[in-house]
Regions:
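Short functional micro-motifs and their immediate structural scaffolds
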Residues: 94-97, 115
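Active-site-adjacent beta-strand/loop module that shapes the phosphate/pyrophosphate-binding cleft
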Residues: 183-206
Length: 247
């Protein structure tokens, strides 16, 4: 599998070629500041030509390196989309301005505050003895193995989301729900919370074919070893395969 090496144009590269470019601070990573830059398509292509770079599809980030630049790229993508979609106040239609203290856009007229959109979602590893419930999405670009997943609803705890999503996608009931870890997922503006749980009662699967193309129990020995390291989903699958958790 090809590993895509990520690099970013530096300030001096852009300044030399596009002296009138406008910069917007995003974040700092290991003492390196990252900025959002407004450039025309022609200027972007020129900068890439000068620096020897090229654009890659965001989905290649799943297997890219170095990992700290993957984090920077995904987070930058998340913030770029938020800024791009929030120029005007949704309450009074006046132009929003950046707050001086926190990551927030504020309306100077009515006081409306707009924060970055972060969607809470769960990733669920359902176990059945030495087997793990693996799924594949229906109608999505990502075609590899996944776990049951879904968005948290208003008024719902994350544990309730786990039970509901497993039931909706596979018809299974679960018990002994345990939190594993979380991961920001800027591809889709999400914060992911990973959980492991056990099947409760029958292990007969009823697949929701609108959401999934398949769902099946897979033993540790049958789980593929060539999983991408980036995603929480694949980390959880690997943790189960290697029997490193409390299952």
């Amino acid at each position: 599998q090809d590993i895509h090496q990520i690099s970013f144009p530096r300030y001096e590269d852009i300044k030399a070629e596009c002296p009138d470019a406008k910069y917007q601070y995003l974040f700092t990573l290991d003492d390196t500041a990252f900025f959002r830059v407004a450039l025309s398509h022609a200027d972007k292509m020129h900068i890439l030509e000068v620096t020897g770079g090229k654009f890659i599809n965001r989905h290649y980030m799943r297997s890219a390196a170095p990992k700290e630049y993957v984090l920077a790229a995904i987070t930058g993508f998340h913030l770029d989309g938020w800024y791009d979609k929030n120029h005007f106040c949704g309450r009074c239609a006046n132009r929003l301005v950046e707050d001086d203290v926190e990551r927030m856009l504020r309306c100077p007229v009515c006081g409306n505050m707009v924060y970055p959109r972060i969607n809470p979602a769960v990733i669920v590893g359902v176990t059945n003895g030495d087997k793990l419930l693996l799924t594949k999405y229906n109608g999505r670009e990502y075609k590899k193995y996944a776990l049951v997943a879904g968005f948290n609803e208003i008024g719902e705890s994350l544990e309730e989301t786990v039970r509901r999503e497993v039931m909706e996608e596979t018809g299974l009931r679960v018990k002994n729900i345990r939190y594993y870890k979380s991961q920001p997922w800027g591809f889709t503006d999400n914060i992911l919370a990973g959980y492991f749980c056990e099947v409760d009662g029958t292990d007969e699967i009823e697949v929701d074919m609108q959401e999934l193309s398949m769902a099946k129990w897979v033993s540790r020995e049958e789980i593929p070893t060539s999983l991408e390291e980036l995603s929480l989903t694949n980390e959880m699958i690997s943790v189960f395969r290697l029997d490193k958790g409390d299952f």
